Amino acid sequence: MWGRRRKLRRLNDVTISTCHVSAKVGTRLVFDHDGKIIQKTPYPHPRGTTVSVKQLFSTLPVRHKEFQRNIKKKRACFPFAFCRDCQFLEGSPAMLPVQPAKLTPRSTPPHPCSLEDNVITVFSSVKNGPGSSR
């Protein structure tokens, strides 16, 4: 997976759900902490790819507690991976343990668009709060 020296996979649970434009059904891949696929199943998913990161720092209890304690300060530091066809979920349970039920989808501009457009869309939404636009 990604991260400093490709070790992010060891710090959390990673699931990738994807569906190609020509496919009738998507695929869900669940990875273990060594980066090996432990489950590959058909999954109803819209066109595109979603990367889910859960239990961030769960393998490092001290780091996990520090993360939970400082989540409000560190919130702006989580741009998450995004590409041309993806969504940004502001307030996912992994990010905000205080309010786990509040999810606000942030969609990137329609295809085709540049990486710069995606960054502007995601960060302007986070900076200006829920329901804001560029």
Curated annotation (Swiss-Prot):
One of its GO terms (cellular component) is mismatch repair complex. InterPro entries: HATPase_C_sf, MutL/Mlh/Pms-like. One of its GO terms (molecular function) is ATP-dependent DNA damage sensor activity. It comes from the Eukaryota. One of its GO terms (biological process) is mismatch repair. Gene3D superfamilies: Histidine kinase-like ATPase, C-terminal domain. PANTHER family: DNA MISMATCH REPAIR PROTEIN MLH, PMS, MUTL, MISMATCH REPAIR ENDONUCLEASE PMS2. Encoded by one of the numerous copies of postmeiotic segregation increased 2-like genes scattered in the q11-q22 region of the chromosome 7. Belongs to the DNA mismatch repair MutL/HexB family. This is Postmeiotic segregation increased 2-like protein 5. It comes from Homo sapiens.
